[in-house]
Amino acid sequence: MAHPILRFNVAIIGGGVIGCSVAHFIKSMAPETEVGVIEPDPTYEFASTLRASGGCRVQFSRSENIEMSKFSIDFIKNFQSRMSIPGKEPAEVDWVEGGYLFIVEPESVELLERNVALQNSMGCDVRLLTPQQLKTNFPSMNVTDLGAGAHSPKDGWCDPNGLLWGFRKKAASEGVAFVNAQVVSMDCAPTAVRALNLDGGQVVVAEEFVNAAGAW
């Protein structure tokens, strides 16, 4: 008996937080797009997402990373309203605005100053602190061998499990199909993937493929 062929406009390999968020954003921008997510473990016992710390910070040295972090922090702070589903319990990500603190030795102060200047120029609340200011703000810290610190009080962390399930439930409500299977091989042309072969014998055909598979 021939195995079924599953057809999508976009097929996403991996249903962790990246795969589910990609699926949601595709559907939010193009609701008519047929999206399928292939995930072998619906319990997420070994998923990369659940091994994450959930930290979100703007303290990066490249503008692209800073912009992505600014978007992410704003998105997570408003996650409940963005992921709301009529008649369903709101998504909980337990956002904690605990701030981030980076410290450097004296020879790295100039680099930290450049990074903070870039972050400030992009509208981020990041404060450069001298060793004396570090001691005042964090009395338990030994600052004798420090050159400076950078504190971003509006950074924080969230619950990765809540983030994952918020995206997954929202994507499912938008019509994303979740396929409980493992990708075992791909049929490839010289410059593109044509189809995915699953462990149950099914074949996934799509116009576009996204690799969101994690390390586990």
What are the functions of these language-model segments?
Residues 3-18, 36:
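Beta1/beta-strand and adjacent pyrophosphate-binding region of the FAD-binding site
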Residues 40, 131, 183:
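Active-site loop/turn elements of alpha/beta-hydrolase fold enzymes
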Residues 53-137:
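Dinucleotide-binding Rossmann-like beta1-alpha1 core, especially the glycine-rich loop
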Residues 150-208, 212-216:
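Helical element adjacent to the flavin cofactor pocket in flavoenzyme catalytic cores
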Residues 23, 27, 170:
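Gly/Ala-rich phosphate-binding loop of Rossmann-like dinucleotide-binding domains
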Residues 18, 43, 216:
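Conserved Rossmann-like nucleotide-cofactor binding loop
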Residues 27-49:
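Glycine-rich FAD pyrophosphate-binding loop
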Residues 15, 60, 105, 213-214:
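Glycine-rich, N-terminal phosphate-binding loop of Rossmann-like dinucleotide-binding domains
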